[in-house]
Amino acid sequence: MDLPGPIHDFLLVFLGFGLLVGGLGVVLLPNPIFSAFSLGFVLVCISLFYILSNSHFVAAAQLLIYVGAINVLIIFAVMFMNDSEYSTDFTLWTVGDGITSLVCTTLLFSLISTILDTSWYRVIWTTRLNQILEQDLISNSQQIGIHLSTDFFLPFELISIILLVALIGAISVARQ
């Protein structure tokens, strides 16, 4: 969207805060139904990020595929589970939670240090070459492919990681 600078910045900060709150809700809420709704909120915030980035097709695909299909499927599956164990045996902190928090914090700081140490000059140069190349492209699908592999690579990969973690969590819950 072509918004004035302060409004665009406010919306980015607001959506980022919404992503953080929704992500914490997915991880910290003891009821899996509320966690699934929080995941839906996170996915809607990501699609709004795409709208702010003028990538309306990817935002629509995000809403239709991830929010409309996958999140509804997760909620549908969670509703069929027996939730009596979640309401009675909830402990605030266990040893496994501490180990998981330590591993996740270590991964977060290593990713931040990797991002800060990366030379982004080559990435910007590749993006500029793709913008020159983009003028010669005819079809919209080629333009979407280039944008997904250059401009929106990080959000695209983050969504795939979120889905992988959700599938691993669903498998571990189903095995118990």
UniProtKB/Swiss-Prot annotation:
Class of enzymatic activity (EC top level): translocase
EC number(s) on file: 7.1.1.-
A GO MF label: NADH dehydrogenase (ubiquinone) activity
Reaction(s) catalysed (UniProt annotation): a plastoquinone + NADH + (n+1) H(+)(in) = a plastoquinol + NAD(+) + n H(+)(out); a plastoquinone + NADPH + (n+1) H(+)(in) = a plastoquinol + NADP(+) + n H(+)(out)
Subcellular localization, as worded in the UniProt entry: Plastid, Chloroplast thylakoid membrane
Record key words, sorted: Chloroplast, Membrane, NAD, NADP, Plastid, Plastoquinone, Quinone, Thylakoid, Translocase, Transmembrane, Transmembrane helix, Transport
Transmembrane segments: 10-30, 32-52, 61-81, 92-112, 152-172
Role played: NDH shuttles electrons from NAD(P)H:plastoquinone, via FMN and iron-sulfur (Fe-S) centers, to quinones in the photosynthetic chain and possibly in a chloroplast respiratory chain. The immediate electron acceptor for the enzyme in this species is believed to be plastoquinone. Couples the redox reaction to proton translocation, and thus conserves the redox energy in a proton gradient.
Family indicated by similarity: Belongs to the complex I subunit 6 family.
Annotated protein name in UniProt: NAD(P)H-quinone oxidoreductase subunit 6, chloroplastic
Gene designation: ndhG
